[in-house]
Amino acid sequence: MQITKQLFDLQDEKYGDFQCKLTPGVSRESIIGVRIPAARKLAKQYMKEAESAEFVRDLPHKYYDENMLHGLLLSEYKNFDKCVKAVEEFLPYVDNWAVCDIMSPKVFKKHKDELLPKIKEWIASDHVYTCRFGMEMLMCHYLDDDFRAEYLELPANVHSEEYYVNMMIAWFFATALAKQWDAAIGYIEQGRLDTWVHNKTIQKARESYRIT
């Protein structure tokens, strides 16, 4: 496929070595080594090409960088329903935090009412990165003007042994403390979160410099 060839044309071996250290569980052989700015540029270029539709249907991908590009392509979708469908087709194949976190569909901002039920489904998933993605979307889109205190219950009710799920819960509540202190502080004061998540939330909140 032409897209994969172009990824190899952008290869940076040293960056691949660096990225491998940041993504446990991802083999060095599966990492081409494409820097994110170059991948973003390629995604914007291919959104206008018919090959991008073929690429997102061609699952699973062989390379980590193909998955990163896939996530970046989904972030550029203009149609909400098509975006959600494509996201849900891709999520089962997401197997690391970097690919999960690179997905940030811009179209979601304009469809908050339709998005929330999907977020609830994703958070309830047993798949690590589907759950993580759901919480990240809740954090990105519902801690500001569209905030409701009840939304904090969604991540608070997730109890997991998975590191990348628990890190996301901590990240969510550290952000909630910065943006919605009055609603979020009770979860800390009342010990509502699992011990590890509780401690990590406090650590991340302090490190963010948004809370003193």
Regions found by a protein language model. Name each.
Residues M1-T212:
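Alpha-helical scaffold domains
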